[in-house]
Amino acid sequence: MSEAGHNLHALFPDHGPALHALKLGSSNFRQLAEEHHDLQSRIQRVEAGLAAVADDQLEDLKKRRLFTLDEIAALIAIEEEA
């Protein structure tokens, strides 16, 4: 499993079967998971002092990360209702 998949399993520990099904069957989910992973990596680099961005840019990255998590959570809910 990719690092992005491991990260999502840590964030949504009670939804493993839905995450697995979405990973296999939803290109939209895979795109969101990859975007979340990329955003998380960028934020971590900035917070560790390895990359520099303006404060407003960091806030935008964090907002985008939350948006992707909301979208992922919505897909999980739909998958679990099916």
Description of each model-found segment:
Residues 1-82:
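Extended, charge-rich alpha-helical interface modules
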